[in-house]
Swiss-Prot record:
Pfam families cross-referenced by the UniProt entry: Ubie_methyltran
Record gene name: ubiE
Top-level class of the enzyme under EC nomenclature: transferase
Function: Methyltransferase required for the conversion of demethylmenaquinol (DMKH2) to menaquinol (MKH2) and the conversion of 2-polyprenyl-6-methoxy-1,4-benzoquinol (DDMQH2) to 2-polyprenyl-3-methyl-6-methoxy-1,4-benzoquinol (DMQH2).
Family classification: Belongs to the class I-like SAM-binding methyltransferase superfamily. MenG/UbiE family.
Biological processes, Gene Ontology terms: aerobic respiration; menaquinone biosynthetic process; methylation
Domain of life, source organism: Bacteria
One annotated GO molecular function: demethylmenaquinone methyltransferase activity
Protein name: Ubiquinone/menaquinone biosynthesis C-methyltransferase UbiE
Keyword Ubl conjugation: no
Catalytic activity: a 2-demethylmenaquinol + S-adenosyl-L-methionine = a menaquinol + S-adenosyl-L-homocysteine + H(+); a 2-methoxy-6-(all-trans-polyprenyl)benzene-1,4-diol + S-adenosyl-L-methionine = a 5-methoxy-2-methyl-3-(all-trans-polyprenyl)benzene-1,4-diol + S-adenosyl-L-homocysteine + H(+)
Listed SUPFAM superfamilies: S-adenosyl-L-methionine-dependent methyltransferases
PROSITE patterns: SAM_MT_UBIE (PS51608), UBIE_1 (PS01183), UBIE_2 (PS01184)
Length: 259
């Protein structure tokens, strides 16, 4: 068992499986198992974990991106297997842009591909099973890189951010939406009580298994706070790094540019 203190810009997430310390190299397999279990109920899980607010936060993320209405505009949505963010981006582009949805988990991608077909968005989307730490793309390929509620599950976040920088075109934008550190004294206590007591129990009711939800709640607490994560983005090479808190810091949208 490790401390519940947040990791920092110096690292630590690579050996943190929630509040449990694991050998470096083992975390990815453990995280994969979590998402194989929750794939078909992933968006319901996000509703439980955010009281439905993740939908508003994702809409705000897409508004901040303001994707070009242009067939040449290319987005890479990482850890986006179910397509929830990519669908929003394509719709915001009047179904003109193209999004590559990358996820390391095949179960999540299967859900996304099925949904894309039902929404008649398959022509605008490519689904790729790959690791965010080793992107299978050439440098300077994408206009935008997005990731929503997925970066904290990547073992080596610093490596993933450097890969994001590599595959973005000059002038390209990084947007990362992630649960973060609540900055309102009363809200932080309420949110902690909800997270550690209610969410695993709701997860058990929905899926019959509380363990994946326990990990996800603990991983939120371990993730670097807003300032530390902004530092990590700058260290990866990004410029004009900013963040916007949503709902008192329950979530934050970080932005950076490859200039």
């Amino acid at each position: 068992m490790m401390t519940d203190a947040r990791t920092t810009a110096e690292g630590g997430m690579e050996t943190s499986y929630g509040f449990h310390k694991v050998d470096e190299g083992k975390k990815q397999g453990l995280v994969n198992e979590v998402f194989h279990k929750v794939a078909k109920r992933y968006d319901i899980m996000n509703d439980v974990m955010s009281a439905g607010l993740h939908r508003l936060w994702k809409d705000a993320m897409v508004s901040a991106l303001s994707p070009r209405k242009d067939p040449s505009y290319k987005i890479l949505d990482v850890a986006g297997g179910t397509g929830d963010v990519a669908f929003r981006i394509i719709e915001a582009s009047n179904r003109l842009a193209h999004a590559t949805v990358l996820d390391i988990n095949g179960s999540m991608l299967a859900v996304g591909e099925e949904r894309a077909a039902k929404k008649k968005l398959s022509d605008n989307l490519t689904f790729v099973e790959a690791n965010a730490e080793e992107l299978p793309f050439e440098a300077n390929t994408f206009d935008a890189y997005t990731v929503a509620f997925g970066i904290r599950n990547v073992p080596r976040i610093d490596v993933a951010l450097k890969e994001a920088y590599r595959v973005l075109k000059r002038g390209g934008r990084l947007l990362v939406l992630e649960f973060s550190e609540v900055d309102m004294p009363l809200l932080d206590r309420v949110y902690d009580a909800w997270s550690f007591n209610a969410i695993p129990q709701f997860g058990k009711m929905i899926t019959g298994d509380a363990e994946p939800y326990q990990y996800l709640v603990e991983s939120i607490r371990k993730f670097p706070n807003q300032e530390d994560f902004a530092t990590m983005i700058r260290t990866a090479g990004f410029s004009r790094v900013t963040y916007t808190n949503y709902t008192g810091g329950i979530a934050a949208l970080h932005s950076g540019w490859k200039l």
